[in-house]
Amino acid sequence: MGYNVSGLTSYVETNKDVLVKDAVLGGNIKGETLSMFTKQLGVKTKERLNYLDVDPVLQDGSSCGFSAQGSTVLTDRDIETAVIKYNDQWCWKAMLGRFSEYQVRINANEDSLPFESEITDQIVKGINKKVETLIWQGDKDDGDLINGLITIAEGSDSASTITGATASGATAYERILDTYMLIPEAWVDEAVIFVSPAIFRQYAQDLVAKNFFHYDGENGELTELFIPGSDVKVRKTYGLTGVDKIYASVPANMVYACDMLDANEDFKMWYNDEDELVKVKVLFNAGVATLYPDAVVLTTPAA
């Protein structure tokens, strides 16, 4: 028994780095946020994130002497990944009798897949979309492979995480403003507010109604807007589609863990001469965590 792997690998191998990077970093999808995350590489299954917090104390230096003051706190937090795969296969003969049969050559050496580049492109986009949803909405208790940021915030054991707070405003603008006012002062300058496309759409219309909105259309799709009177951005997040909660944090606080971004994640397509099937295999690991619970605000709408 043997395999003929020379048929379809040329397209995938030539672009392998692009395919792998796009598939695990959210390339070329609408509203992706994974590229904003801090990356923790070399994580196989579970690892501790080590970080420190330094608080220097300024003293009166008008006299001689030395008095050590201040604090340096070393902290760690677990981040866990799941090994994720995608497997599929196609029989090129299934194209016979269909509109696509013009791309099929009927012979014993046929080892190509009609619309190969289109299929691989859709695979990458599909993985992007599912990973984006997983890192935000994943819940292992519901059978998902990892816990996403919403689940992590809701289950935080830190009293400093602001979760379950009610954004009492009736409009998206008022709810987002309520969330903004809950962001701790120490983090607000770097914070971003993440909302679903539905909330973002309503927010944009609320700004129009208040005459706070200006968009010239030159920058393509509208994915973020500032809160008027601040430098905090509101980000349209497709991973939050269907979620009526508002999440605010500092992007550097949001960690995406994996083994390697290119070397070990595998995107492979090949022709199996034994069963005459074209097969694809994608394999990578992924997980998310937050470093500082007190830099997270999660609000729910008023009942």
Where are these regions (language model features)?
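Helix N-cap / beta->alpha transition motif
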Residues: 91-102, 195-199, 249-251, 291-292
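Ordered core of a single globular domain
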Residues: 174-210
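Sequence/fold signature of self-assembling virion shell proteins
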Residues: 2-59, 110, 151-170, 202-303
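Short secondary-structure junctions and interdomain/linker hinges
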Residues: 30-31, 130, 134, 183-190, ...
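Short coil/turn segments at secondary-structure boundaries
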Residues: 135-140, 190-196, 216-219
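Long, hydrophobic/aromatic-enriched structural stretches that serve as scaffold segments
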Residues: 55-113, 117
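Alpha-helical scaffold segments that mediate packing/assembly in large oligomeric complexes
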Residues: 96, 100-181, 298-303
